[in-house]
Amino acid sequence: NSPGYPSNVQFVFNMGGAMGDTSWLEAGDAPMVAFHPVGDPFAPYGVGNVIVPTTGQFVVEVGGSREAIRLSNEKGNNACFANAGFTDALTTYANTVNEGFEGLYPLYTNPAQQAGPWEWFDSTATVFYASFLPPPYNTAGGTAYSSALITNPDMSKAKALAYLDTIMGYLNPRVVYCLNLS
């Protein structure tokens, strides 16, 4: 762990990420919930390659959200919420598409190959703030915004907030339940 940061993690959640080495997961680790676009072109939903968004270059094979949650369930780490009896609409939906992996919320996007549908930012602000960076990055704001649209073509605040609402609606009851916060 990094010096100065505590390592007594009590709950983990992930949005579109992956584990560099799934052997890091051990029985007794914190419960885990993950949200992941199934067609994410950069970080695999299952087991696969991480790709650099700007170059398309291979980085490393990793375990995506599906694999991390599968292993977390296999090791009993999600037992605190697996049988909690959640019956809300988000849980009901997740359970129809997550192959029985409690804590996994697959995101089926349109178009299918999207990364980070919960992201949005203002093109004017992006260009403006980039102008304060040293060359050659000071002219990259427009490129950054245009590149983001490739994998999130209908990016908007309304879309992002709808995804974040779903994420919070599914995640928060599990955190509250497992950490006895009610």
Protein language model features and the residues they cover:
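Catalytic active-site module of serine/aspartate enzymes centered on a nucleophile-bearing elbow/loop
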Residues: 109-182
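Alpha-helix initiation/capping motif
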Residues: 21, 26, 44, 61-64, ...
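Active-site-adjacent alpha-helix of alpha/beta-hydrolase-fold enzymes
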Residues: 30-124, 130
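Extracytoplasmic/secreted proteins, especially bacterial periplasmic and envelope-associated proteins
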Residues: 8, 63-71, 166, 170, ...
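Sec-exported extracytoplasmic/periplasmic mature domains
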Residues: 17, 73-77, 176, 180
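Generic detector of intrinsically disordered, low-complexity, polar/charged segments
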Residues: 1, 14, 97-100, 113, ...
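Primarily recognizes the serine-hydrolase "nucleophile elbow" in alpha/beta-hydrolase
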Residues: 1-28
